[in-house]
Amino acid sequence: MCASCLHNANAASFLMETFSRHRLNFICIGKMNIFYNVTSLDNKYSFHNPSAPVPHSSHALSSRQAHFTSFRAPVAPPSRPRRSQLPSSAKLLYCFDSSFSTEKRELMLFSMNFISSQTCVTFEENCSIPNRVQLVNGKGCSSYIGMNNIVQHLTFNDTCIDFGTAVHELMHALGVIHTHSRLDRDNFLNINLTNVSKEMMHNYAIFNQSTNVVPYEYGSTMHYYANISTMFPKKSEYSATLGIGRVTFYDMVILNTAYNCKCPNELLCGNGGYTNPSKCSECICPLGYGGVLCDRPSLIGKDTGLPLEVKDKIIEVKVVGIDNFFSYPTCLINGLEIKYMGDPRITNPIYCSADLINGKSFRSKLNPLLMNIHTLFGKNKVTFHYRYVTERLSGYNKTTNGYDNYEYYD
């Protein structure tokens, strides 16, 4: 069967009054378990004018993209602590500096509320306690890692006004390191330190005292952008996924594990979800799943319909073509993610270049199969063929991610 999906997502028209990172629309395509998920990103914090021509030159970068090419360079002093130090409790004290604009305050408060809605971590404004984070307008976007019993600066200038970057720096203050500083990072990245300047070298240091609690997540908001001369994923299909700034399911798992966030009674959440420690009556679901127990696709919108069950079948998708996708060093502007991997929680490769995905086929270990599109603005079109094959999912072995007990088809 063939399907063509067309979506006009001018985020400015319906999201300018919010700081929401995404808005979800699931549309049932055809008569199989395929769901098309449009994520319209909020361009209140994007540095892009939807009505202006989008540059195609790799040198014509927006402020935020230029910031990615410098890898969100921390500018803390050379004595910046390298060991992750968790705050003594799940409460982070902060104070807004007088230099911090109203817009940045609103974004930071929204980002804090997002983290609190997914974890047991809370934030309290307190400008008198020494052990606090002082949010200041300064050079670049940076934060110490963990708390150090001092008034420490979280620097957030005008190139940082973005939800993913705000969460990134707050997670640093909460003790979370960069993904590419994990002990096992060399299993997933090729890094050429000869091309890294001395002042940037600390950004590539491995934390020997760190503890991994989730699989390596190329899509994490804690991961820097890929650069062929310095850092590139060993799974090359992830080259445009690194650094897009999307806050992932596993990002919040890190915080919940680090702070031992739990509910008195655990719900039986489906599809890899888990009980929300901030609201114990519901589950936190991987992107694309909904319901109180994450037991169904998250259908939002009119006339979405219901899928025809094709139980125990592998679904195959072939992308015929993508149109009006803008390919930059990352899929920051827009991207297509086909959830074909067995773990519904992990970020799959995200594509925004027709040269890399047109004609490419995927066989999914998930049924139903989810397809995610995120976009800042514009009209994106995806045309694909899909079918189910005679091979059965139950013929595959089940495995776990090595960090928890949830099983999925390998």
From Swiss-Prot:
Q: What class of enzyme is it?
A: hydrolase
**Which SMART domains does the UniProt entry name for this protein?**
ZnMc
Please list the residues that bind Zn(2+): 168, 172, 178
Kindly list every residue the record annotates as glycosylated. 37, 126, 157, 192, 195, 208, 227, 397
Locations listed in the record: Secreted
Q: From which residue to which does any coiled coil extend? A: none
Enzyme active site: 169
Q: Which residues form the Peptidase M12A domain?
A: 73-262
Please verify whether the record's keywords include Nuclease.
no
The name this protein carries in UniProt is Zinc metalloproteinase nas-18
Record organism:
Caenorhabditis elegans
Q: Which gene encodes it?
A: nas-18
